[in-house]
């Protein structure tokens, strides 16, 4: 499908991007946004860029693309901000970008519009916006799959490591499908819901108080708030984003930190992940909580008590609108009391996951 033949996007939306010193990568992202299916000069895609604390040519690079006519299918709002002190981080910048996007849609009379966010160093397939909106027909929030946009000259051992790590997380989801399959997020699905690709309606974003302005993990914190409100999170395999494989990033604990960790594995550092038994315990606990929600009166309280939830916790959980919210809120309480997961090297973790899945299937 080409831009000339693509059906126009019916639901109003805006893409919200925090950017700091991204004069090289941001033009690549903007080019991929300008090529999104369903948008054209007469029906442009709204984009907010929060350029924070930039000391390079990030904003001039944007203006150069505009002057060249390369962004005709976009309506751009570039906000320059100088964040200070403890607020000078990606959490504040992403919050400001999303808030600006929400206000834009509300001002245009579209409070039912959709906020999408991605990273300034990402690259998007042409159907990214359309795939998000399709997935939202049966969900409240959509997370996109992260595909590492690796350098072709990178060590092939690194690509093999990426594949093994992905297989580990696919194995965790396979356990979930066997023990407690989520009806709102059926297989096939991925497991990513980060700021590199997230879609949420404006009204729902406002209802949970917006994105927590944390220096790291702001995206996961927002998703937690959404799930605890009862939102159906979909990990649609059709929604994907290419993310940078660079080792030097803007955030400690972000994607660049993970890429640097993986690079060290090639030098002999072990890559440790939770043992399979941890996931089995966690999934079964969440399954028990899900069943408990549908029990009435004292039966629910008794089921919660067996898991270690006292009367006060049970009373607080009475306000949960559905089983999604109940499981997320109750599990947060229980997880805070749990010991850290035991970890083991990647190869053993993979073997244990495969063996556990096989034994569960044979026992079914």
Question: Over which residues does each language-model region extend?
Answer:
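N-proximal low-complexity "stem/linker" segments adjacent to membrane-targeting elements
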Residues: 1-43
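Acidic donor-binding/catalytic loop of UDP-sugar-dependent glycosyltransferases
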Residues: 57, 110-134
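Conserved donor NDP-sugar-binding/catalytic core segment of glycosyltransferases
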Residues: 127-164
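Terminal low-complexity segments of carbohydrate-biosynthetic enzymes
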Residues: 261-364
